[in-house]
């Protein structure tokens, strides 16, 4: 396993017959059974691989608007040993119930909370899971309907890096959370119940890094092939950091490029007007533009490796056209068959 589970628990928040939200609290942590280990390992892997996550920190009431400090205060007591895990998670469930009660759309769910260690850091994972209906075949070959936790489609989840939180009080990125579809962040109530305030614009930092890399290769004496190798190296480094759940470190990245004969990127990036943080989380979808060009519009979708530009793919900005040399075999086959049919 890639994680070492300390404790885990599930509480339920549901609606009663009058439509009021109620908490059903589990009186003891989950046993560290194989089922629990498999569930948390799957959730850890699914969460870590999610791109486009947001990052924030525990807000201060007044300085950060109406940020509620109740969750962070209870977490602090738990970490100090003044509050048990069951008591802490029970308080968290009550806070979530109170926050959910402010909205008409909420029907609750199963609140999973787990403390575990990964890559020498302690984490608190918080997720509101929903049940999903499925069918199974019984021993007598009859069909039966049952419900199971939908682990592969988590939308309301956050992870607190407890080690970073306690080691660096000025950090603004020790809480990560899943953003919703179409660029929207996770439902406000889920962040509000934890008192979380967004602190780092990850996409903006990654976009700025990409611009710095493009300016760096444009101002260098590198050949076209070497420039693409530089872009690829940056993408590979950032992808590895993303997969490990670690931050991009500009100094570390510059050292990687220096090993490939591309010196002085650190001074270039820090000396310009890029306003890059020394460390920030990776956003693979943004950085993928270093390797690929892609776009969709008007019923046309195009994607190709950056190394093909100027060779197999010729762009003419004057006539607003792309010329593709060597049409992919499967596309060529479809086009040929369509032409024959006409």
Swiss-Prot record:
GO cellular component, one term: cytoplasm
Keywords annotated in UniProt: Cytoplasm
InterPro entries: Nucleoid_associated_NdpA
Pfam family, one: NA37
Subcellular location: Cytoplasm, Nucleoid
Source organism superkingdom: Bacteria
Gene Ontology terms for molecular function: double-stranded DNA binding; single-stranded RNA binding
Family: Belongs to the YejK family.
HAMAP family: NdpA
Protein name: Nucleoid-associated protein Shewmr4_2217
